[in-house]
Amino acid sequence: MGLKNFLEKIEHHFEAGGKLEKYYPLYEAAATIFYTQGKVTPGASHVRDAIDLKRMMILVWFAVFPAMFWGMYNVGYQAIPALNQLYSGAELQQVIAGDWHYRLAQMLGASLTPDAGWASKMLLGAAYFLPIYAVVFLVGGFWEVVFSIVRKHEINEGFFVTSILFSLIVPPTLPLWQAALGISFGVVIGKEIFGGTGRNFLNPALAGRAFLFFAYPAQISGDLVWTSADGFSGATPLSQWSVNGSHSLVNTVSGQPITWMDAFLGYIPGSIGEVSTLMILIGGAIIIFGRVASWRIVAGVMIGMIATAYLFNWIGSTTNPLFAMPWYWHLVLGGFAFGMIFMATDPVSASFTNKGKWWYGGLIGVMCILIRVANPAYPEGMMLAILFANLFAPLFDYVVVQANIKRRKARGE
C-alpha cells in the first residue's frame, strides 16, 4: 500500500462526522507535507499561482540553511580555542565532563583539542544549536496545533520559519527553558492572539527575542553568552567598537585584529545565524529571486542605513566612537544583515504596497543606526527597529492608498 493510498484510506476518520474529526488539522498538516490538496482555498480564488503558503515557507526555511550551517561551524570555531585557552589537562577534562554539550559532541566523534578540524567544530556547534532548534520547533508546533484544534482550521506552516529564525537570532548558550519561553511568547502573544498567520502585525520571532531581552537580559546579551566556552568572556565586535572605535576590534580568543573580511565571512562571535553576512546574502538571493521577499524592502533598509550612517559620520563625536562607524561596517556587524533579509521582509508584518515598502524599509535602516549610535549602552538596534517599523507598516499602506485614491479622483474631475 502506497503512502497516498494509506492517507486516502484514513482520511474519512478525520473529516466532519468522523471519530477523529477534531484532529483534522493534524492529518491535514501531515498529508500536505507530501501532497498538495486539490482544493487550496475554501472560497473564491482571485489569484492563482504555482506556489502555496506551505511551499513559500519551505523556500524560506531552506534559504536560511547557509547561515545556519555556517553558524554551527562558527560556534565550534570560537568555542574550542577558547576552551583550550582557559583550561588544560585534568581541569579541562573536568569542565568537559560537567557540560552536556561537550559530552554530546564527543559522543558524536568530535575532538575538543586545539588542533580540532572543521568536522569537530561543526559537531560542537550542532550540539549547541540543534537542541535549541528542537525545543523551539516542538514548543512552537505545540501551540500551533492547540490553536488549530480550538479554532478548527488547518495548521499554518508559518511556525516552520518562525522556529528556525528564532533559533538563529539567539546566543548559542541560551538555556533551553528560556528558548521554550521565548518562542511561546512569540507564537501566542505575538501571533495567535491576533488571529494567527496572516493577521499578526509583529514579527513573532522578534517578539519572542524581545521578550527574552527584557525579561532575561543576562542570558541574551552581555559578554558571557556569545562564546560557548564555560567561563569565557568576550564582547561582540559591535560592543568593542562602541568602546574605542575600530582600533578595539580584536578577536577575544586569538588576540588578532578583526578585519572587515573576517566579519563579512563570519569569523566573529554573535548570535548563531547572524555572524556571516555572505551566507545571509546567499539566502537572501534565494528568497528575493523566488519572489518571497521584497527587494524594495531590502533596498529601503540599505538606503536608510547608509544615509543615517553618513549623517552621523558627518556630525562626528569626541565621546562616542560609533558616530564614526562607516556604513559598510554596520552592514557586517550585529544582526543588521540577518534582520534586513529574513526579518524585515516578513510579508505579514511588513507593508503591502510597493511605495509603503520603501518607506517601511527606510524607517528600519534609519532606526537601526539611530539606536546603535545614540544609545551606546545597547549597541544593537535591528530587533527594536524592525518591531518599531512593524507598528508603522499599516500607516504607510494607509497613506499610500489614500494618496492613490485622491490622485485618481483628481484625474476624473
From Swiss-Prot:
EC number(s) given by UniProt: 7.2.1.1
Gene Ontology terms: biological process: respiratory electron transport chain; sodium ion transport; transmembrane transport
Membrane topology designation: Multi-pass membrane protein
EC top class named in words: translocase
Reactions performed catalytically: a ubiquinone + n Na(+)(in) + NADH + H(+) = a ubiquinol + n Na(+)(out) + NAD(+)
MF (Gene Ontology): FMN binding; oxidoreductase activity, acting on NAD(P)H, quinone or similar compound as acceptor
GO cellular component, one term: plasma membrane
Record-annotated membrane-spanning stretches: 56-76, 123-143, 169-189, 270-290, 297-317, 322-342, 358-378, 381-401
Keywords assigned by UniProt, alphabetized: Cell inner membrane, Cell membrane, Flavoprotein, FMN, Ion transport, Membrane, NAD, Phosphoprotein, Sodium, Sodium transport, Translocase, Transmembrane, Transmembrane helix, Transport, Ubiquinone
UniProt-annotated location(s): Cell inner membrane
Cofactor: FMN
Modified residues (FMN phosphoryl threonine): 236
Assembly and oligomerization: Composed of six subunits; NqrA, NqrB, NqrC, NqrD, NqrE and NqrF.
PANTHER family: ELECTRON TRANSPORT COMPLEX PROTEIN RNFD (PTHR30578), NA(+)-TRANSLOCATING NADH-QUINONE REDUCTASE SUBUNIT B (PTHR30578:SF1)
Family, as annotated: Belongs to the NqrB/RnfD family.
Function: NQR complex catalyzes the reduction of ubiquinone-1 to ubiquinol by two successive reactions, coupled with the transport of Na(+) ions from the cytoplasm to the periplasm. NqrA to NqrE are probably involved in the second step, the conversion of ubisemiquinone to ubiquinol.
Name of the protein described by the UniProt record: Na(+)-translocating NADH-quinone reductase subunit B
Organism: Yersinia pestis
